[in-house]
């Protein structure tokens, strides 16, 4: 009797639009289509890293319930329009940008002054309508984050963020707009009780649908690998866990598992960084001192770690484990 579970052998990606794609995976054992489809959908909607405006300061505005002379929209609608802008930061985690325009005319996202490493994916997005004599002058802070973070739960310790007139926004960082999945019947040879998983993914352009599902799958693997590493221990007089058993198994995986570019991987190995646990303890400044490792490689490393819920500069008390091989 067949005891091994089938794994999908056919994975196809069909682009429906520039930011929408249909991903088909088959065959799965009966029931696994719903199991994996629902898990992937939840991760895609909640755990992808993206960018969003988080704070706004508008000249002449003290709070969000104000109005501006010569501006058709009130401040509440201005803020809603700002949250509809799709930003993409290339080499930083946050940036403050300026928007200044005088009427009459329409204010769109392309009127924002941007540094060279910041991109707006929907430049024609309308922000406001100005009449003759109307003027709009604002500063917008854009940050990198994950999921949805309401403004009232964000914590600020910097006094500069508490000045009057600075408005904190609810931030929706997720680059994934919509995800749906369907499970169809599949057949392999004489077996007709199998599943085919069909997922339709739409993003805002910051991330391609194919890259989104790849990152979601990687997040699931990294979360579940902890359970795969569970070991049964015999009862003994010493019940204290060993030093190596306290370390997340994911941190003991080689940096090759991060699938970095050859250049980045070679730079890390030259610095004796062989495991993910070695890497996350390094700071950005330390890595930038590595020969041949520039800002582009650093950003690649940060993005790959962020997709796994990790970051540079982390502290590990139980590293390295005693049984770790170099």
From Swiss-Prot:
Q: Does the keyword Amino-acid biosynthesis apply?
A: no
Region annotation (Alpha C-terminal domain (alpha-CTD)) ranges: 247-326
Q: Name one GO cellular component term.
A: cytoplasm
Q: Which reactions does this protein catalyse?
A: RNA(n) + a ribonucleoside 5'-triphosphate = RNA(n+1) + diphosphate
Q: Which Gene Ontology terms cover its molecular function?
A: DNA binding; DNA-directed RNA polymerase activity; protein dimerization activity
- Main role? DNA-dependent RNA polymerase catalyzes the transcription of DNA into RNA using the four ribonucleoside triphosphates as substrates.
State what protein this is by name: DNA-directed RNA polymerase subunit alpha
Record organism? Polynucleobacter asymbioticus (strain DSM 18221 / CIP 109841 / QLW-P1DMWA-1) (Polynucleobacter necessarius subsp. asymbioticus)
Organism lineage: Bacteria, Pseudomonadati, Pseudomonadota, Betaproteobacteria, Burkholderiales
Q: Gene for this protein?
A: rpoA
């Amino acid at each position: 009797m067949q005891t091994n579970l089938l794994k999908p052998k056919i994975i196809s990606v069909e682009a429906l639009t520039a930011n929408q794609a249909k991903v088909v995976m088959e065959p799965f054992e009966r029931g696994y289509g719903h199991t994996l489809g629902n898990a992937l959908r939840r991760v895609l909607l909640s755990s992808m890293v993206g960018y969003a405006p988080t704070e706004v300061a508008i000249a002449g505005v003290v709070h969000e319930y104000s109005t501006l002379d010569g501006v058709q929209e009130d401040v509440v609608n201005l803020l809603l329009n700002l949250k509809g802008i799709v930003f993409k930061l290339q080499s930083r985690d946050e940036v403050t940008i300026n928007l200044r325009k005088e009427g009459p005319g329409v204010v769109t996202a392309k009127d924002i002054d941007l540094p060279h490493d910041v991109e707006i994916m929907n430049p024609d997005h309308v922000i406001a309508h100005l009449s003759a004599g109307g003027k709009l002058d604002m500063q917008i802070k854009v940050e990198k984050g994950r999921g949805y973070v309401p403004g009232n739960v964000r914590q600020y310790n910097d006094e500069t963020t508490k000045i009057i007139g600075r408005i904190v926004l609810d931030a929706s960082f997720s680059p994934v707009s919509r995800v749906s999945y369907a499970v169809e019947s599949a057949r392999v040879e004489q077996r007709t009780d199998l599943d085919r998983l069909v997922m339709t993914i739409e993003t805002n352009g910051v991330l391609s649908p194919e890259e989104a599902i790849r990152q979601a799958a990687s997040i699931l693997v990294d979360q579940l690998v902890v359970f795969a590493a569970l070991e049964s221990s015999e009862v003994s007089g010493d019940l204290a866990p060993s030093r190596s058993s306290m370390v997340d198994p994911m941190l003991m995986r080689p940096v090759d598992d991060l699938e970095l570019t050859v250049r980045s991987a070679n730079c890390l190995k030259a610095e004796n960084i062989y495991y993910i646990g070695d890497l996350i303890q390094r700071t950005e400044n330390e890595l930038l001192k590595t020969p041949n490792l520039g800002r582009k490689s650093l950003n690649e490393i940060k993005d790959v770690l962020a997709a796994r819920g990790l970051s540079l500069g982390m502290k590990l008390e139980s590293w390295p484990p005693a049984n770790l091989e170099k």
